[in-house]
Amino acid sequence: MKKNFKRRDFLKKAGIGAAAATAVSSFPAPAIAADRIEVNCVATWGRGYPGLGTGGEAVSQRISDLSDGRIVVNHFAGGERVGPLDVFTEVTSGNAQMYNSADYYWVGQHPGWGFFAAVPFGMIATEINGWIRHGGGQELWDELGDEFGLKNFMAGNSGVQMGGWFNKEINSPDDFKGLKMRIPGLGGMMMSKLGLSVVGVPGGQIYENLINGTIDATEWVGPWNDERSRFYEAAKYYYWPGCHEPGTLITLGCNKSWLTSLSKTDQMIIEHASTVQNERMLTEYNANNGAALQRLVNLSLIHISEPTRRYAISYAVFCLK
Protein backbone atom coordinates (compact mmCIF):
# COMPACT_ATOMS: atom_id res chain seq x y z
CA MET A 1 0.00 0.00 0.00
CA LYS A 2 2.79 2.40 0.90
CA LYS A 3 4.36 1.96 -2.53
CA ASN A 4 1.04 2.77 -4.28
CA PHE A 5 0.60 5.97 -2.28
CA LYS A 6 4.11 7.09 -3.19
CA ARG A 7 3.38 6.49 -6.88
CA ARG A 8 0.24 8.63 -6.73
CA ASP A 9 2.09 11.36 -4.87
CA PHE A 10 4.77 11.35 -7.54
CA LEU A 11 2.24 11.73 -10.34
CA LYS A 12 0.50 14.61 -8.57
CA LYS A 13 3.75 16.40 -7.80
CA ALA A 14 4.87 16.04 -11.38
CA GLY A 15 1.65 17.74 -12.46
CA ILE A 16 0.57 14.83 -14.60
CA GLY A 17 -2.79 14.29 -12.95
CA ALA A 18 -5.40 11.57 -13.22
CA ALA A 19 -5.53 11.45 -17.01
CA ALA A 20 -1.83 10.73 -17.27
CA ALA A 21 -2.11 8.09 -14.56
CA THR A 22 -4.78 6.34 -16.61
CA ALA A 23 -2.58 6.45 -19.70
CA VAL A 24 0.39 5.01 -17.81
CA SER A 25 -1.65 2.19 -16.30
CA SER A 26 -3.05 1.19 -19.70
CA PHE A 27 0.27 1.33 -21.55
CA PRO A 28 1.12 -2.42 -21.41
CA ALA A 29 -1.99 -3.45 -23.39
CA PRO A 30 -1.04 -1.84 -26.73
CA ALA A 31 2.57 -2.95 -26.19
CA ILE A 32 1.44 -6.56 -25.91
CA ALA A 33 -0.85 -6.17 -28.90
CA ALA A 34 2.01 -4.78 -30.97
CA ASP A 35 4.13 -7.80 -30.02
CA ARG A 36 1.41 -10.30 -30.91
CA ILE A 37 2.53 -13.03 -33.31
CA GLU A 38 0.06 -14.94 -35.46
CA VAL A 39 1.23 -18.28 -36.82
CA ASN A 40 -0.26 -20.85 -39.20
CA CYS A 41 0.42 -24.52 -38.50
CA VAL A 42 -0.72 -27.10 -41.06
CA ALA A 43 -1.12 -30.72 -40.00
CA THR A 44 -1.37 -34.05 -41.75
CA TRP A 45 -3.99 -35.61 -39.48
CA GLY A 46 -7.67 -34.91 -38.94
CA ARG A 47 -8.99 -32.63 -36.23
CA GLY A 48 -9.67 -34.55 -33.05
CA TYR A 49 -8.08 -37.76 -34.33
CA PRO A 50 -6.73 -39.57 -31.23
CA GLY A 51 -3.02 -39.17 -30.57
CA LEU A 52 -1.81 -37.86 -33.90
CA GLY A 53 -4.44 -35.19 -34.47
CA THR A 54 -4.99 -34.18 -30.87
CA GLY A 55 -1.23 -34.18 -30.27
CA GLY A 56 -0.62 -31.55 -32.93
CA GLU A 57 -3.49 -29.47 -31.62
CA ALA A 58 -1.97 -29.69 -28.13
CA VAL A 59 1.39 -28.38 -29.36
CA SER A 60 -0.28 -25.38 -30.99
CA GLN A 61 -2.31 -24.65 -27.87
CA ARG A 62 0.70 -25.06 -25.60
CA ILE A 63 2.69 -22.53 -27.62
CA SER A 64 -0.10 -20.04 -27.05
CA ASP A 65 -0.38 -20.90 -23.35
CA LEU A 66 3.36 -20.64 -22.68
CA SER A 67 3.42 -17.21 -24.31
CA ASP A 68 0.37 -16.03 -22.32
CA GLY A 69 -1.55 -15.75 -25.56
CA ARG A 70 1.00 -13.53 -27.27
CA ILE A 71 1.75 -16.19 -29.91
CA VAL A 72 -1.52 -17.19 -31.56
CA VAL A 73 -1.32 -20.44 -33.54
CA ASN A 74 -3.99 -21.05 -36.16
CA HIS A 75 -3.97 -24.85 -36.32
CA PHE A 76 -5.24 -26.35 -39.57
CA ALA A 77 -5.96 -30.08 -39.54
CA GLY A 78 -5.35 -32.21 -42.62
CA GLY A 79 -7.39 -30.94 -45.56
CA GLU A 80 -8.55 -27.74 -43.86
CA ARG A 81 -5.98 -25.51 -45.58
CA VAL A 82 -3.92 -27.86 -47.76
CA GLY A 83 -3.92 -31.59 -48.41
CA PRO A 84 -2.57 -33.84 -45.63
CA LEU A 85 0.62 -34.57 -47.57
CA ASP A 86 1.09 -31.02 -48.87
CA VAL A 87 2.08 -29.53 -45.52
CA PHE A 88 5.82 -29.86 -46.22
CA THR A 89 5.64 -27.71 -49.34
CA GLU A 90 3.33 -25.24 -47.62
CA VAL A 91 5.99 -24.53 -45.00
CA THR A 92 9.12 -24.69 -47.19
CA SER A 93 7.46 -22.18 -49.54
CA GLY A 94 6.72 -19.84 -46.64
CA ASN A 95 2.94 -19.99 -47.02
CA ALA A 96 2.71 -21.38 -43.48
CA GLN A 97 5.16 -21.21 -40.62
CA MET A 98 4.89 -24.72 -39.11
CA TYR A 99 3.75 -28.23 -39.97
CA ASN A 100 2.86 -31.20 -37.80
CA SER A 101 3.48 -34.52 -39.52
CA ALA A 102 5.85 -37.48 -39.84
CA ASP A 103 8.95 -36.79 -41.90
CA TYR A 104 8.98 -40.13 -43.73
CA TYR A 105 6.30 -38.70 -46.00
CA TRP A 106 9.03 -36.60 -47.62
CA VAL A 107 11.38 -39.41 -48.73
CA GLY A 108 10.50 -38.46 -52.30
CA GLN A 109 12.15 -35.11 -51.60
CA HIS A 110 15.19 -36.77 -49.97
CA PRO A 111 15.51 -40.36 -48.66
CA GLY A 112 17.20 -39.01 -45.53
CA TRP A 113 13.86 -37.81 -44.18
CA GLY A 114 12.91 -41.40 -43.46
CA PHE A 115 15.54 -41.66 -40.73
CA PHE A 116 13.74 -38.94 -38.76
CA ALA A 117 10.48 -40.85 -38.54
CA ALA A 118 11.04 -44.62 -38.51
CA VAL A 119 13.65 -47.10 -39.72
CA PRO A 120 12.76 -50.78 -40.27
CA PHE A 121 14.22 -52.87 -37.46
CA GLY A 122 15.56 -49.61 -36.08
CA MET A 123 15.24 -47.64 -32.88
CA ILE A 124 12.29 -47.59 -30.52
CA ALA A 125 10.95 -44.30 -29.15
CA THR A 126 13.30 -43.94 -26.18
CA GLU A 127 16.31 -44.77 -28.35
CA ILE A 128 15.24 -42.16 -30.89
CA ASN A 129 15.04 -39.59 -28.09
CA GLY A 130 18.56 -40.47 -27.00
CA TRP A 131 19.95 -40.33 -30.52
CA ILE A 132 18.31 -37.01 -31.39
CA ARG A 133 19.26 -35.30 -28.13
CA HIS A 134 22.61 -36.83 -27.27
CA GLY A 135 23.85 -38.88 -30.22
CA GLY A 136 24.18 -36.30 -32.96
CA GLY A 137 20.74 -36.93 -34.45
CA GLN A 138 19.53 -33.34 -34.11
CA GLU A 139 22.65 -32.08 -35.87
CA LEU A 140 22.02 -34.42 -38.81
CA TRP A 141 18.36 -33.43 -38.84
CA ASP A 142 19.36 -29.76 -38.90
CA GLU A 143 21.80 -30.39 -41.74
CA LEU A 144 19.07 -32.02 -43.81
CA GLY A 145 16.58 -29.34 -42.84
CA ASP A 146 18.95 -26.60 -43.99
CA GLU A 147 18.63 -27.89 -47.55
CA PHE A 148 14.90 -27.15 -47.39
CA GLY A 149 14.91 -24.11 -45.11
CA LEU A 150 13.52 -26.03 -42.13
CA LYS A 151 14.21 -26.46 -38.43
CA ASN A 152 12.48 -29.51 -36.98
CA PHE A 153 11.65 -30.63 -33.44
CA MET A 154 10.48 -33.90 -31.92
CA ALA A 155 6.77 -33.52 -31.17
CA GLY A 156 5.52 -37.03 -30.41
CA ASN A 157 6.00 -40.74 -30.93
CA SER A 158 3.38 -43.44 -31.51
CA GLY A 159 5.63 -46.23 -30.23
CA VAL A 160 5.90 -49.72 -31.73
CA GLN A 161 3.38 -50.20 -34.51
CA MET A 162 1.43 -53.17 -35.81
CA GLY A 163 2.40 -54.94 -39.02
CA GLY A 164 -0.72 -54.04 -40.94
CA TRP A 165 -4.12 -55.10 -42.23
CA PHE A 166 -4.37 -57.50 -45.17
CA ASN A 167 -7.28 -58.82 -47.19
CA LYS A 168 -5.50 -62.15 -47.69
CA GLU A 169 -3.54 -64.42 -45.40
CA ILE A 170 0.25 -64.10 -45.48
CA ASN A 171 2.05 -67.43 -45.13
CA SER A 172 5.22 -66.79 -47.12
CA PRO A 173 7.09 -63.91 -48.79
CA ASP A 174 5.55 -64.94 -52.11
CA ASP A 175 2.14 -63.90 -50.79
CA PHE A 176 3.21 -60.26 -50.97
CA LYS A 177 3.78 -60.34 -54.72
CA GLY A 178 1.24 -58.29 -56.62
CA LEU A 179 -0.37 -56.74 -53.55
CA LYS A 180 -1.04 -53.01 -53.44
CA MET A 181 -0.14 -51.74 -49.97
CA ARG A 182 -0.29 -48.36 -48.33
CA ILE A 183 3.02 -48.07 -46.44
CA PRO A 184 5.22 -44.93 -46.39
CA GLY A 185 8.87 -44.13 -45.84
CA LEU A 186 11.76 -46.56 -45.64
CA GLY A 187 9.30 -49.31 -44.72
CA GLY A 188 7.65 -48.89 -48.10
CA MET A 189 11.01 -49.06 -49.85
CA MET A 190 11.79 -52.28 -48.00
CA MET A 191 8.42 -53.92 -48.67
CA SER A 192 8.58 -53.10 -52.37
CA LYS A 193 11.50 -55.53 -52.58
CA LEU A 194 9.07 -58.29 -51.66
CA GLY A 195 7.18 -57.64 -54.88
CA LEU A 196 4.27 -55.53 -53.71
CA SER A 197 3.32 -52.12 -55.05
CA VAL A 198 3.55 -49.23 -52.60
CA VAL A 199 0.62 -46.82 -52.78
CA GLY A 200 0.57 -43.39 -51.15
CA VAL A 201 -2.72 -42.77 -49.34
CA PRO A 202 -3.40 -40.13 -46.65
CA GLY A 203 -4.64 -41.54 -43.36
CA GLY A 204 -8.16 -40.21 -43.76
CA GLN A 205 -8.60 -42.04 -47.07
CA ILE A 206 -7.23 -45.46 -46.09
CA TYR A 207 -10.55 -47.01 -45.02
CA GLU A 208 -12.27 -46.09 -48.28
CA ASN A 209 -9.38 -47.37 -50.39
CA LEU A 210 -9.15 -50.61 -48.43
CA ILE A 211 -12.84 -51.43 -48.41
CA ASN A 212 -13.33 -50.72 -52.14
CA GLY A 213 -10.27 -52.76 -53.15
CA THR A 214 -8.10 -49.90 -54.41
CA ILE A 215 -5.47 -51.24 -52.02
CA ASP A 216 -5.10 -54.78 -50.69
CA ALA A 217 -3.31 -53.96 -47.46
CA THR A 218 -2.30 -51.11 -45.23
CA GLU A 219 -0.23 -50.33 -42.23
CA TRP A 220 -1.36 -47.42 -40.08
CA VAL A 221 -0.37 -47.03 -36.45
CA GLY A 222 -1.50 -49.41 -33.72
CA PRO A 223 -4.67 -50.81 -32.13
CA TRP A 224 -5.87 -47.50 -30.68
CA ASN A 225 -5.86 -45.68 -34.02
CA ASP A 226 -6.65 -48.75 -36.12
CA GLU A 227 -9.80 -49.39 -34.09
CA ARG A 228 -10.87 -45.76 -34.47
CA SER A 229 -10.41 -45.99 -38.24
CA ARG A 230 -12.53 -49.20 -38.37
CA PHE A 231 -10.08 -51.16 -40.49
CA TYR A 232 -11.55 -54.35 -39.03
CA GLU A 233 -14.52 -53.74 -41.34
CA ALA A 234 -12.30 -53.73 -44.42
CA ALA A 235 -9.68 -56.46 -43.84
CA LYS A 236 -9.65 -59.79 -42.00
CA TYR A 237 -5.96 -60.31 -41.25
CA TYR A 238 -4.15 -58.15 -38.71
CA TYR A 239 -0.43 -58.88 -38.30
CA TRP A 240 2.15 -57.90 -35.73
CA PRO A 241 4.72 -56.65 -34.88
CA GLY A 242 5.39 -53.61 -37.03
CA CYS A 243 9.01 -54.34 -37.95
CA HIS A 244 8.85 -51.44 -40.40
CA GLU A 245 8.13 -48.87 -37.65
CA PRO A 246 9.44 -49.81 -34.19
CA GLY A 247 8.96 -46.23 -33.01
CA THR A 248 7.55 -43.50 -35.21
CA LEU A 249 8.68 -39.94 -34.55
CA ILE A 250 6.22 -37.10 -35.06
CA THR A 251 7.59 -33.72 -36.10
CA LEU A 252 6.90 -30.04 -35.63
CA GLY A 253 8.64 -28.57 -38.67
CA CYS A 254 9.30 -24.82 -38.76
CA ASN A 255 10.23 -22.51 -41.59
CA LYS A 256 13.75 -21.66 -40.50
CA SER A 257 13.79 -18.07 -41.77
CA TRP A 258 10.64 -17.34 -39.83
CA LEU A 259 11.81 -19.17 -36.69
CA THR A 260 15.16 -17.41 -36.51
CA SER A 261 13.42 -14.05 -36.87
CA LEU A 262 11.81 -14.63 -33.47
CA SER A 263 13.35 -13.81 -30.12
CA LYS A 264 15.33 -16.54 -28.36
CA THR A 265 12.53 -16.73 -25.79
CA ASP A 266 9.89 -17.39 -28.44
CA GLN A 267 12.09 -19.99 -30.12
CA MET A 268 12.46 -21.76 -26.78
CA ILE A 269 8.69 -21.65 -26.22
CA ILE A 270 8.12 -23.46 -29.51
CA GLU A 271 10.80 -26.05 -28.79
CA HIS A 272 9.54 -26.63 -25.25
CA ALA A 273 5.94 -27.07 -26.41
CA SER A 274 7.15 -29.76 -28.82
CA THR A 275 9.32 -31.48 -26.21
CA VAL A 276 6.43 -31.77 -23.76
CA GLN A 277 4.19 -33.34 -26.40
CA ASN A 278 6.94 -35.74 -27.45
CA GLU A 279 6.79 -37.35 -24.01
CA ARG A 280 3.03 -37.13 -23.56
CA MET A 281 2.09 -38.70 -26.87
CA LEU A 282 4.12 -41.85 -26.23
CA THR A 283 2.55 -42.37 -22.81
CA GLU A 284 -0.90 -41.81 -24.32
CA TYR A 285 -0.33 -44.53 -26.92
CA ASN A 286 1.08 -46.91 -24.33
CA ALA A 287 -1.96 -46.32 -22.13
CA ASN A 288 -4.53 -46.90 -24.88
CA ASN A 289 -3.12 -49.54 -27.24
CA GLY A 290 -3.53 -52.52 -24.91
CA ALA A 291 -7.22 -51.99 -24.23
CA ALA A 292 -7.91 -51.29 -27.90
CA LEU A 293 -6.15 -54.51 -28.93
CA GLN A 294 -8.28 -56.48 -26.49
CA ARG A 295 -11.44 -54.97 -27.94
CA LEU A 296 -10.31 -55.95 -31.43
CA VAL A 297 -9.64 -59.50 -30.22
CA ASN A 298 -13.12 -59.63 -28.72
CA LEU A 299 -14.70 -58.77 -32.06
CA SER A 300 -13.86 -62.28 -33.35
CA LEU A 301 -14.15 -60.90 -36.86
CA ILE A 302 -10.46 -60.78 -37.65
CA HIS A 303 -7.41 -63.01 -37.39
CA ILE A 304 -4.68 -61.42 -35.26
CA SER A 305 -1.42 -63.29 -35.51
CA GLU A 306 2.34 -63.07 -35.80
CA PRO A 307 3.67 -63.69 -39.32
CA THR A 308 5.53 -66.88 -40.05
CA ARG A 309 9.18 -67.08 -39.05
CA ARG A 310 10.15 -67.22 -42.70
CA TYR A 311 8.31 -63.97 -43.33
CA ALA A 312 10.13 -62.28 -40.45
CA ILE A 313 13.52 -63.51 -41.69
CA SER A 314 12.72 -62.19 -45.15
CA TYR A 315 11.97 -58.79 -43.60
CA ALA A 316 15.47 -58.77 -42.14
CA VAL A 317 17.17 -59.97 -45.32
CA PHE A 318 15.59 -57.26 -47.45
CA CYS A 319 16.31 -54.66 -44.81
CA LEU A 320 20.03 -55.41 -45.09
CA LYS A 321 20.17 -55.19 -48.89
What are these regions (language model features)?
Residues 2-128, 138-139, 143-305, 309-310:
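N-terminal secretory/targeting leader peptides
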Residues 130-133:
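Short, Φ-rich (hydrophobic/aromatic) sequence segments
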Residues 306-308, 313-321:
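Positively charged, low-complexity/disordered segments
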